[in-house]
């Protein structure tokens, strides 16, 4: 009886399995079955529609944050519990996310404890302060979005500011942020902000840092590595809490890359002054849920227009950018990079229209090279070693405008700046005034050196009585000595004073 019941259950289970399996088409064989399996595997790498934040991910799957293309990537878990490398293209960089079980996560971590001590420096000011940033000079040129940088700014808030112009809104754009948050290294003596530079890689490590007012959640240890070839690596050693649970009320919380360009415009309030406007032209945002203990992210740079050094290679490039050659600047660009101010000032957008490289070679109008001293970032810059950061307010007139295609960008087509004409009479007047001042100075020097000359006696005899008498006396140990006589009082002697 038991054997019959067991056989009946087995038949029922087999029938249910057949009912749940997909229908097998006519002519199906084992070869087609393997091909169907391979097709399903390939489909696992295709783009899928964006999932809303309210959706719950299915077990065995993970999700990468959206890129600028507006989609997401979903990956499956392999049978050996290893995770496929999550790869995404962000136009300027290809990002790869390695989970805690990946060997690459350990290989990409730079252990400063075993590194050459002469190359490791602990920044004492940043390690004992909150909301501070300090400028550091690299030993090599680091290409960031195609721009070679030699100076960066390390901030206590878990990010590196990559801009040239320091301002109070460093958290807004132009950053390399492994984990930007309200960290306070000054809370604990064990918290340090250190950096390492061996000529091929520059590493910044935030070691055992605590969140402001959330110290009970534990310490964070992570690093950002800038490689000489342009690669950027984020390594996470200790992440005691979910990044999504970190409050952004007092400080932005984000991870990724960002760059922007600066435009100088005349201020509508004060026509004589200029307003600096920052336009963010690209950003890479990482999914905060992927930032866990012993995880890593690697950004590999993609070719940009700026790398082309000739007109032929520029116009024949197969990049996703619309590269154009500006002969007057001798530069290849899409028009949207840190040199956009020059691109607009010299009319490069109009120059490239309808012209070929042969036209540039024969055109003598563009034979003169531009002034090499011109920089789109001319202006007052902060040179102090530390800078207070306040992402909520700003002391200057710098604004942040997220760039949208064709919105809000001024188009300066004229390469020349207009100003009031300088008349010849003004120049002559200035020259005469300079000559008059020079003559007075020379006369004074002569009189001081020859007090008994006719000229000196002439001025002394005709000076008003209420003027103080100025007498000059040479002393071997001091440069100049003066004697000042108050009006109405005559006295002998002099007062010595060393000229500073």
UniProtKB/Swiss-Prot annotation:
Residues 448-500 are cytoplasmic. Glycans are attached at residues 34, 81, 116, 190, 198, 318, 322. Keywords: Cell junction, Cell membrane, Glycoprotein, Membrane, Proteoglycan, Secreted, Signal, Tight junction, Transmembrane, Transmembrane helix. GO terms for cellular component: bicellular tight junction; cytoplasm; dendrite; extracellular region; neuronal cell body; plasma membrane; receptor complex. Residues 22-72, 360-379, 399-420, 481-500 are annotated as: Disordered. It is a single-pass type I membrane protein. The keyword Signal applies. The keyword Glycoprotein applies. Its main location: membrane. It comes from the Eukaryota. Residues 366-379 have a biased composition (Polar residues). The chain crosses the membrane at residues 427-447. Detected in brain. Highly expressed in Purkinje cells of the cerebellum. Coiled coil: none annotated. Residues 1-19 form the signal peptide. GO terms for biological process: spinal cord development. It is found in: Cell membrane; Cell junction, Tight junction; Secreted. Interacts with NID1. May interact with CTTN. Plays a critical role in endothelial cell capillary morphogenesis. Belongs to the plexin family. This is Plexin domain-containing protein 1. It comes from Mus musculus. The gene is Plxdc1.
């Amino acid at each position: 009886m038991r054997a019959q019941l067991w056989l009946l259950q087995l038949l029922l289970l087999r029938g249910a399995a057949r009912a749940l399996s997909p229908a097998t088409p006519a002519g199906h064989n084992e070869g087609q079955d393997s091909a169907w399996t391979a097709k399903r595997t390939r489909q696992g790498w295709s783009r899928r529609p964006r999932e809303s934040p309210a959706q719950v991910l299915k077990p065995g799957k993970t999700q990468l944050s959206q890129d600028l293309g507006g989609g997401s990537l979903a990956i499956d878990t392999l049978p050996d519990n290893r995770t496929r490398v999550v790869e995404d293209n962000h136009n300027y960089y290809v990002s790869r996310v390695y989970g805690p079980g990946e060997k690459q996560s350990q290989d990409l971590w730079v252990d400063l404890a075993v590194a050459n001590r002469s190359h490791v420096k602990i920044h004492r000011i940043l390690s004992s302060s909150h909301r501070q940033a300090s400028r550091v000079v690299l030993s090599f040129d680091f290409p960031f979005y195609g721009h070679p940088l030699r100076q960066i700014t390390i901030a206590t808030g878990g990010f590196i500011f990559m801009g040239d112009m320091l301002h109070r809104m460093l958290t807004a754009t132009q950053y390399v942020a492994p984990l930007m948050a309200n960290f306070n290294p000054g809370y604990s003596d064990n918290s340090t902000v250190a950096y390492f530079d061996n000529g091929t890689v520059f590493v910044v490590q935030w070691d055992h840092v605590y969140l402001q007012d959330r110290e009970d959640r534990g310490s964070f240890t992570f690093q950002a590595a800038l490689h000489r070839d342009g690669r950027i690596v984020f390594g996470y050693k200790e992440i005691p809490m979910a990044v999504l649970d970190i409050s952004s009320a007092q400080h932005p919380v984000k991870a990724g890359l960002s760059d922007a360009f600066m435009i100088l415009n005349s201020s509508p309030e004060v026509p004589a002054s200029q307003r600096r406007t920052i336009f963010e032209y690209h950003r890479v945002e990482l999914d905060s849920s992927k930032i866990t203990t012993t995880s890593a992210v690697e950004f590999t740079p993609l070719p940009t227009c700026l790398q082309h050094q000739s007109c032929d290679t520029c116009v024949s490039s197969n990049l996703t950018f619309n590269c154009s050659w500006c002969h007057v600047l001798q530069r290849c660009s899409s028009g949207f990079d840190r040199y956009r101010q020059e691109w607009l000032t010299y009319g490069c957008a109009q120059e490239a229209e309808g012209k070929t490289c042969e036209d540039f070679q024969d055109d003598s109008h563009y034979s003169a090279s531009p002034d090499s001293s011109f920089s789109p970032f001319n202006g007052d810059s902060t040179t102090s070693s530390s800078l207070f950061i306040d992402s909520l307010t700003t002391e200057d007139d710098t604004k942040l405008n997220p760039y949208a295609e064709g919105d809000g960008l001024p188009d300066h087509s004229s390469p020349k700046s207009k100003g009031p004409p300088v008349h010849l009479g003004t120049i002559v007047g200035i020259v005469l005034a300079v000559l008059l001042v020079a003559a007075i100075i020379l006369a004074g020097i002569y009189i001081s050196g020859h007090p008994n000359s006719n000229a000196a006696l002439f001025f002394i005899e005709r000076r008003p009585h209420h003027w103080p008498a100025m007498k000059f006396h040479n002393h071997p140990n001091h440069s100049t000595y003066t004697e000042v006589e108050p009006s109405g009082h005559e006295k002998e002697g002099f007062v010595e004073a060393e000229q500073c």
